[in-house]
Amino acid sequence: MSCGGSARKRRWWLITWSKHHGSFRKIPVPNPVQYSYTWIGLGTSEGVSAIAEPELPATFTFAEAEGRGLSRRRLQRLQDVGAVERIGRGLYRRTDEEPADHDLIEIAAKAHQPTLCLLSALARHELTDVIPPVHDVAIPRGAWQPAVSAPVQWHKFAPATFDVGRTGIRLDDTYAIGLYDAPRTIVDTFRLRHAVGPDIANEALRRWLRHGGKPADLMRLTKIFPAAKPALLHTLQVLL
């Protein structure tokens, strides 16, 4: 499949749709044989062109792109025309994918068992009106703390109890991130109220009870996290 008649030099183009720019972007491809593309014929005034879509996941690293035949120079060209955007250190995302939280994807891609906790988890459960200035993310104590461009406050939680109340959020087709459920989050805000603040912890508990939360669920968790029990029990007695 070539552009123009048989007398012309054979040329190939990588053409992708950019949602950001609202138009097709065309990039010359010197040797398409070395790349893995899905090719679709498109009639134009110059003959038949080729639309090539690189077989890359929605979010990928440079190493993954390189493994599929894209050089650093070509990856930069894809960024220049708006087909790909850099969303973190060494992390890229195709612009023709659905919108996603780039910060959380970067954290999920680089950290071991990252889990939204404390204020970030309260916000997810609609137990606070405070907008978290950074992402509160728990990782197991002893795990490597990665360097990321996203604003994040890392919290080291004990490995033995790390999975208690841990659920997850799907971010895209490739990545998911952990999230502590509401009872675990409330207990954490009371045992770590020096980091969150007593007013935020008390309001979160008040809202949770208002929406049908059962105090017994929290008291069971205090057997695992005894540091939360005194302040939590006192606040429950005041509210109830």
Model-derived features with residue positions:
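Short, positively charged and aromatic/hydrophobic N-terminal segments
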Residues: 30, 34-38, 44
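Short, composition-biased local secondary-structure segments
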Residues: 41-51
